[in-house]
UniProtKB/Swiss-Prot annotation:
PANTHER family documented for this protein: ISOCITRATE DEHYDROGENASE KINASE_PHOSPHATASE, PTHR39559
Subcellular location: Cytoplasm
EC number, as in UniProt: 2.7.11.5, 3.1.3.-
Name assigned to this protein: Isocitrate dehydrogenase kinase/phosphatase
Pfam families: AceK_kinase, AceK_regulatory
Positions bound to ATP: A328, P329, G330, I331, K332, G333, L334, K349
Organism annotation: Ralstonia pickettii (strain 12J)
Alphabetized NCBIfam families for the sequence: PRK02946.1
Gene Ontology terms: biological process: glucose metabolic process; glyoxylate cycle; tricarboxylic acid cycle
Reactions catalysed according to its record: L-seryl-[isocitrate dehydrogenase] + ATP = O-phospho-L-seryl-[isocitrate dehydrogenase] + ADP + H(+)
A GO molecular-function descriptor: AMP binding
Length: 611
């Protein structure tokens, strides 16, 4: 049973708690400043600056945790504070969070500082927040009524949907001109009419729009919901900027599946200015009820909060399940030992202690590759990973074959201990956790002809989008790619990735002799960063169905000129345009040049109906 002091008598306890909260408040202030700067970068088309903001922000959390830990060590000798004082520190911290707007994130920051200062064998659940202590329900921003979490709009007035949406756009106060906002709003109204058709407008017909834009890649997104009667529908509108500095509304997304892809774990984190992050998460969860809160926090750039919630969800699942962790099905990797819990939709990846030929790498190099992916634009084609250290699992839940594999291939990563209740635990010293997907090689082997064709189209698109983002996957075997539940192909094996601009793209030289021509070995010199696209045929086109689909849709994949073209554009400073939605949904592809007149007519019809 937890023991808590009846009297908070320590000044040091209060001072330590105050120092921790000051550290978090500094972190969140800097976090929000990045989102404000992202708006300026978007308005001016500073795409490199936008990417740099994204990379810098990822490092902020750990920097503030280190900073707070150093202060506590230097000023309070925190490592030697006794148990009674630590319990008081936690209670003081809870008191300081009264009326705080980010209490859940502050609690996570508190945990991070504690676990950094105290060895895992010392700190216990009395010292940290295993569960949240402060509710995030109904937190309101009373200090700034001009910027609530969301604004409500009522298109059922005589002004109609067009005028309503014009107010929505203008309220974001973007400091850049629109190319033709009237045209774009006409497109929006037309698309909404096509999607919903004839529907009866209820008395509560309204649109709620989150007060901050969502910035990512070269786009800013308006995110909201449409409420009519007892129905709620998602609303997302990407805003793009052209080379002339003019803005346009690119499309309108009205289906839950589209929003799920927009907030997928395969995309980089959004930059959003949120005073009350829990309110944004609640709003988004209303639109995506199947999406875990952990993933929503992560997609909003609060990856440590997402990581904390994921672990709580994981412990809850362990408590309410009984199946065992097993070696993940499929082809075993040379670098990673992968295991899974069948009842849980994730895989756990442990770096092996040694790597058989032809792998030439190290543990630190592999970790640096995963960190590169964390910092880089994943463009919807690379799975995000959660990285944990010293994770304790119930030993009884591990299959015997899995334990043998761990002890054989990663003995330095495994140790055993007794839990607080006396049970046996296996501790994994370092592990990556990723969403479980269907391996592409299995998809292609077992799928119908239509599924094979879809898989190959997606595979080729995924590679092309990755190299457009300056990522060369390295090992492009189908087993290193997965298929998500939305049918998208995603890369998830990062130990051989390189920047495309660091690669030397070559064609295989003509053989000089008959011996070279007949040789089964590579007879020409190959440097460490040389790539030969024409040789990919050998290991990608073995299956006749795969070959037919590949040559039909991606014949240029095996031409060095295609790869070189992407590299040259990157070296010239060009940034590719990526869309987190089907390009067919874009207004330019849906309506083309003749759309404005038709859109205006649809706008009038909807206005009349709304009135």
């Amino acid at each position: 049973m937890s023991h808590f002091p009846k009297l908070l008598s320590s000044q040091i306890a209060f001072d330590v708690a105050r120092t921790m909260l000051d550290g978090f408040d500094k972190h969140y202030r800097l976090f929000r400043e990045v989102s404000v700067q992202a708006k300026t970068a978007f308005e001016t088309g500073d795409w490199a600056g936008l990417q740099q903001l994204q990379r810098d922000r990822i490092a902020y959390y750990d920097e503030r945790v280190r900073e707070a830990s150093v202060i506590l060590e230097d000023e309070y000798d925190a490592e030697n504070i006794d148990d009674e004082i630590w319990r008081q520190i936690k209670l003081h911290f809870i008191g300081l969070l009264t009326n705080h707007h980010q209490p859940e994130c502050a609690e996570t920051f508190f945990n991070s500082v504690c676990t950094r200062i105290l060895h895992r064998s010392y700190f216990n659940n009395d010292f940290i927040f295993v569960r949240p202590a402060i509710s995030t329900e109904y937190i309101e921003n009373e200090e700034s009524p001009t910027k609530p979490t969301y604004r409500a709009y009522y298109p059922g007035t005589r002004d109609g949907l067009g005028a309503c949406f014009e107010r929505i756009v203008h309220n974001f106060q973007l400091n850049a001109p629109f190319e033709d906002l009237e045209r774009d709003i006409g497109y929006v109204v037309r698309a909404v009419g096509e999607h919903f058709g004839d529907f009866r407008i209820a008395p509560n017909f309204q649109i709620h729009v989150l007060s901050s834009l969502f910035f990512r890649n070269k786009a800013a997104y308006i995110i909201g919901r449409v409420i009519n009667g007892d129905k709620t529908f998602p609303l997302a509108v990407p805003i793009l900027r052209n080379a002339a500095g003019q803005l346009s509304l690119d499309t309108v997304l009205l289906r839950q599946e589209q929003l799920l892809i927009l907030f997928s774990f395969t995309h980089s984190y959004f930059m959003v200015d949120m005073e009350i992050p829990s309110a944004y998460v609640t709003f988004l969860r209303d639109l995506m009820p199947r999406k875990p809160r952990a993933e929503i926090y992560t997609s909003l750039g609060l990856q440590k909060q997402g990581k904390n919630l994921f672990y709580r969800d994981f412990l809850h699942h362990l408590q309410h399940s009984s199946d065992k962790f097993i070696i993940a099905p499929g082809i075993k990797g040379l670098v990673m030992l992968v295991f899974t819990l069948p009842s849980y939709p994730y895989v756990f990846k442990v770096i092996k202690d040694y790597f058989p030929p032809p792998k030439e790498t190290t543990r630190e190099l592999i970790k640096s590759k995963y960190q590169l992916v964390k910092r880089h634009d994943r463009v919807g084609r690379m799975a995000d990973t959660l990285e944990y250290s010293d994770v304790a699992f119930p030993l009884s839940r591990f299959d015997d074959d899995l334990i043998k594999e761990l002890e054989k291939h990663a003995p330095s990563m495994v140790e055993y201990q007794r839990s607080e209740d006396g049970g046996e635990e296996i501790v994994i010293r370092h592990v990556y956790i990723e969403r479980r997907m269907t391996p592409l090689n299995i998809w292609l082997h077992e799928g119908t002809d239509a599924q094979v064709e879809h898989g190959i189209i997606e595979y080729g698109n995924a590679i092309k989008e990755l190299i457009a983002a300056n990522i060369f996957p390295g090992d492009m075997l189908y087993k290193n790619f997965g298929v998500t539940r939305h049918g998208r192909v995603v890369f998830y094996d990062y130990d051989e990735i390189e920047y495309l601009t660091d690669c030397n793209i070559r064609t295989v030289p003509e053989p000089r002799t008959e011996e070279e021509e007949m040789s089964g070995e590579v007879w020409y010199n190959v440097g460490p960063h040389d790539i030969f696209p024409e040789t990919y045929r050998t290991f990608l086109l073995g299956d006749p169905r795969v070959r037919e689909a590949f040559l039909k849709h991606h014949a240029d994949f095996f031409e060095a000129s295609m790869w070189q073209g992407y590299k040259e554009r990157l070296l010239s400073g060009q940034m590719h345009d990526f869309y987190a939605y089907d390009a067919a949904e874009r207004f330019v592809n849906r309506y083309g040049a003749s759309a404005p007149d038709n859109a205006a007519q649809d706008n009038t019809t909807l206005q009349r109906a709304a009135a």
